[in-house]
Amino acid sequence: MKTQSLIDCIEMTDSYKRYGKVKRVIGLMIESKGPASSIGDLCLIYAKGQSGKVIKAEVVGFQEENILLMPYLEAASIAPGSIVEATGESLRVKVGTGLIGQVIDAFGEPLDGKLLPKGLSPVSTEQSPPNPMKRPPIREKMGVGVRSIDSLLTVGKGQRIGIFAGSGVGKSTLMGMIAKQTEADLNVIALVGERGREVREFIEKDLGKEGLKRSIVVVATSDQPALMRLKAAYTATAIAEYFRDKGQNVMFMMDSVTRVAMAQREIGLAAGEPPTTKGYTPSVFAILPRLLERTGANEHGTITAFYTVLVDGDDMNEPIADTVRGILDGHIVLDRALANKGQFPAVNVLKSISRVMSNISTKQHLDAANKFRELLSTYQNSEDLINIGAYKRGSSREIDEAIQFYPQLIQFLKQGTDEPALLEESIAALTSLTGNEE
């Protein structure tokens, strides 16, 4: 009986390998007649001539009976009639503890040209978000080593937060501080669409040797094709998921989700999607929730995620910023005006919020944070009157108190890049400053 079933399987097996052929290339898109494949499948295109070059491409759409492919790398060697082979699966990368301390590309290959260590497991970059009913509630704090965040915008294990800022306000520096000082087991950092110069600068200056020892950095620079930039985000997320499923608490950082959206916009427009708000295609707003919902907690471990959002002209209501803010569990606003005054990190605590802080903090801690915000808000609302000398002391008890405390508030918010700040010490300093000690 067993022999007969094996014979039946052999007879049903298609012994032919079917290939397709490139028909034309228009802009970023390659149109091919066959082979049979699905959206997201990885295909191999064999360049004509003596180069023997094999170019990886992904199926991004269909047009009549042809498939639309987008290459991961430059398509310079592709010509009409180039053979296309379907692999039947999506992009997979090799993951394991051997990647810690490495800087890799979207394919999971080291950028220094060295071979990958042995003992890595292949995982698909396309995963489903955890079942909402299997997500444990956030109940524990996650120290990030930044005093203003730990005390006033306390982050929980498995929380997802956006860092909203314009260019040159200190996003990379803040990410480096978090990577070096966080309580997490390891960092996974995605640098998407960055300038080539900035990548090495971030790794050597902001992250440093100590930070890199406990980090995996996934890089796709701005000169690379849109698909590589998009896949870098998926690869980094898949790596973080692997370690979360091993029971670890992962710190995940992506700089920036705006450039991920721009990469998807390029792909969507090339595939023929209609542009909507600010030229973004409908697929941009479809992939963002799918990508961002993959992080967080599951029954095995946690991914605490920080996504930077580059806001054009410091406009916090532009489409990507607005969409991401609605998906995440809180947002941190870096203010250019504070940076110009020399306050670093330039966190505007009055415009920022952590949506899980009330669930993981004591009443004493929350009262101290509210008191701090009240004092800072009172001073800022009256700052013009105070600066021109129009306010007379004694006119308002609240303003008098705010003036008295203001220098201490600003000093509390300032922190050097190499100045360590433990979670409990930051909270204790806050309660002491506001007089909310037990």
Swiss-Prot record:
Protein keywords: ATP synthesis, ATP-binding, Bacterial flagellum biogenesis, Bacterial flagellum protein export, Cytoplasm, Hydrogen ion transport, Ion transport, Nucleotide-binding, Protein transport, Translocase, Transport
Any GO BP: bacterial-type flagellum assembly
Alphabetized GO MF terms: ATP binding; ATP hydrolysis activity
Enzyme class of the recorded protein, top EC level: translocase
GO cellular component labels: cytoplasm; type III protein secretion system complex
Binding positions (ATP): 165-172
InterPro entries: AAA+_ATPase (IPR003593), Armadillo (IPR000225), ATPase_a/bsu_AS (IPR020003), ATPase_alpha/beta_chains (IPR050053), ATPase_F1/V1/A1_a/bsu_N (IPR004100), ATPase_F1/V1/A1_a/bsu_nucl-bd (IPR000194), ATPase_T3SS_FliI/YscN (IPR005714), FliI_clade2 (IPR022425)
Record Gene3D superfamilies: 3.40.50.12240
Localization in the cell: Cytoplasm
Heme listed as a keyword: no
Coiled coil: none
Catalysed transformations (reactions): ATP + H2O + 4 H(+)(in) = ADP + phosphate + 5 H(+)(out)
PANTHER family found in the cross-reference section: ATP SYNTHASE, SPI-1 TYPE 3 SECRETION SYSTEM ATPASE
The family this protein is said to belong to: Belongs to the ATPase alpha/beta chains family.
Name the UniProt record assigns to this protein: Flagellum-specific ATP synthase
Organism whose genome encodes this protein: Bacillus subtilis (strain 168)
Lineage start: Bacteria, Bacillati, Bacillota, Bacilli, Bacillales
